[in-house]
Design a protein with these regions (language model features):
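Glycine-rich SAM-binding Motif I of class I
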Residues: 72-76
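Conserved SAM-binding motif I beta-strand of class I
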Residues: 87-96
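Helix-to-beta-strand junctions that scaffold the AdoMet/dcAdoMet cofactor pocket
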Residues: 82-87, 181-183
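C-terminal substrate-binding/active-site "lid" region of AdoMet-derived donor-dependent transferases
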Residues: 149-154, 167-239
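S-adenosyl-L-methionine
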Residues: 97-156, 168
Length: 239
C-alpha cells in the first residue's frame, strides 16, 4: 500500500513547479509587461509569476483575494490560467485608490471574467476590517449546510490570498489577511529584500518587522520558503 505523504511533503508538493502548465508567458501578460516598461514601473520576474500561478492552480481555490493588483501583470497570469477551468473561482482584486481601477476592469473584460472577478478600490487594511466584521456576523451561516451567507465585501473566507504590495505595507497586509483565511487557506507573498550593508535604519527596521512576523506565527502556521531565480516565494498556511 502506498504510504500517505506527510503534511510537510504535501506542502512541498503544493509549492513545487507545475510543468503541465507550461513556461510561456501569456500574451496579455506579455503586453502588460511591455506597458510596465513604458510606464517605468516594475513587476516580478517571469519565474516568480509562473510559480505563483503554478501554486495557485494546484491549490484549486474557490475564493481568491489578490492584494496589490497594480496594472494587472500578475493578474493576467492568473486570469489566463483560471479562465480555462470549468468551475471559476470567486476572485477579488484589491488596488487601493482608483489610479489603476479602470485598467484592471478592462483586463477582466478581456478575459470575459466580469461575472466572477471584482475590483475593489479600497485600501486593503480597510477592506480587511469590513471582512473580519462580516465573517464574525455571518459565522453561523458559514457553518450551515442549508443556508448561504451573502453580501461579503470580498471573496470570503479566502482559500488563497496573494500579497503583492510594497515592503512598506507587506507585514501589515499579511497580519490583516490571516483572519480572512479559510480552514486550508494559503497566503503567497515574496520575501522582502535582505538589507545590504549600509542600508538605512528604516530599511533595517522594516526587515526586522518581517522577521518578527515569521517568528510570531510559526507556531500556528506552516511557512514555506521557495528560492527562485531572483526572489524567494513565501507560503503561509494554518497547521
Amino acid at each position: 500500500m502506498d504510504e500517505v505523504p506527510s503534511e510537510r511533503d504535501a506542502f512541498a508538493w503544493l509549492l513545487s513547479e507545475n510543468i503541465e502548465l507550461g513556461e510561456e508567458e501569456p500574451k496579455i501578460a506579455a503586453a502588460i509587461n511591455e506597458q510596465l516598461a513604458h510606464m517605468e514601473l516594475t513587476s516580478h520576474d517571469e519565474f516568480t509569476l509562473r510559480r505563483i500561478r503554478d501554486v495557485a492552480i494546484r491549490h484549486d481555490p474557490k475564493k481568491i483575494i489578490e492584494v496589490g493588483g497594480g496594472i494587472g501583470h500578475l493578474t493576467a497570469w492568473l486570469l489566463d490560467a483560471f479562465s480555462s477551468k470549468v468551475d471559476k473561482p470567486e476572485y477579488t482584486i484589491v488596488e487601493g485608490g482608483n489610479k489603476f481601477a479602470a485598467i484592471l476592469l478592462r483586463l477582466t473584460q478581456r478575459f470575459n471574467a466580469s461575472d466572477w472577478v471584482r475590483v475593489s478600490g479600497m485600501r486593503f487594511q480597510e477592506l480587511a476590517g469590513e471582512s473580519k466584521a462580516w465573517l464574525l456576523s455571518n459565522q453561523a451561516l458559514l457553518n450551515s449546510n442549508s443556508m448561504e451567507a451573502t453580501g461579503a465585501p470580498a471573496s470570503l473566507p479566502a482559500d488563497l490570498i496573494i500579497i503583492d504590495v510594497g515592503e512598506l505595507e507587506q507585514v501589515e497586509c499579511i497580519q490583516e489577511s490571516l483572519p480572512l483565511l479559510s480552514k486550508n487557506g494559503l497566503i503567497l507573498t515574496v520575501e522582502p529584500n535582505v538589507p545590504f550593508e549600509g542600508a538605512s535604519e528604516e530599511e533595517s527596521n522594516r526587515f526586522q518587522l518581517w522577521m518578527d512576523l515569521i517568528r510570531d506565527i510559526q507556531e500556528t502556521y506552516r511557512i514555506g520558503f521557495v528560492p527562485l531565480k531572483k526572489t524567494t516565494l513565501v507560503a503561509i498556511m494554518s497547521k
